[in-house]
Amino acid sequence: MSTQKIGFFGLMKSFDSAESAFETMAGGGLTATVKHELMRGVTIDHLIWWFRNIDQTTTFNGGDFDGAAIDVYKLWHPHDHIKVRWKKKITDDSGHIQPGSVIGIHETFGGFVVNESSLITQFDREGFHFQMGILGLKVGHLLHFYREIDGGVLYETEMEIKCRAPLIGKLLTWLACRFFATEPKIRAWMQHNIEECGESEKFIPQLYEHSRTVNSESGRRVSASECIPTSSH
């Protein structure tokens, strides 16, 4: 059992706080699933807002918003997260991020460095899903499922490494599992995923509410300025 890390808000979740499974798939490939403890006080609105704004900064210090500026991504996992950014944004008329968008993730866990771009295949009130590829072909996915219940959100993550393309699928699966997504790397990711998701309830609701307050106050200032009569000459 690994030693629990200390994040910005105290002890991070231990590996055994979640239900997890790792499997070698028939015909090649790997799959890992993590069912997290209830994210207490978190809602679907919080999570959707979070993923849309995951590349932003904040001054939240755990108590108020008078701290130094920091990437919100680093609050999620201060030890492992380096940088995240939306490399391509496809939005609807309301500005909501749509499938086809691309997110770039730079992080490290268990001695493994990740600096990759992933295609968003679903982003709605049921899940936030990525597709991973080699040479333009899908070789795996990372799925985030969430469901709101009384008291919080049930959150489950699934990673699968397997290419189902005809003819070269088995070869690409072997290459991916041999060089890019090895068993030790996937197991290290599972620990990382449990730790970062466990931090969500400690700061995402606060950032969400602060954003709503700031936007509301900004809207009131705009409305007031629009109501100021101009003098006529």
Predicted regions and their residues:
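Active-site/pore-lining binding-face segments in mid-to-C-terminal subdomains
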Residues: G136, Y146, G151
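Terminal "cap-and-tail" regions of soluble proteins that handle hydrophobic small molecules
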Residues: M1-T31, I149-H233
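Hydrophobic/aromatic beta-strand elements that line small-molecule binding cavities or substrate pockets
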Residues: K35-L38, E116-T121, H141-E148, E158-I161
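Glycine-rich portal/gate segments that line the openings of hydrophobic small-molecule binding cavities
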Residues: I70-L137
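Hydrophobic ligand-binding cavity/cleft-lining segments
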Residues: S2-I90
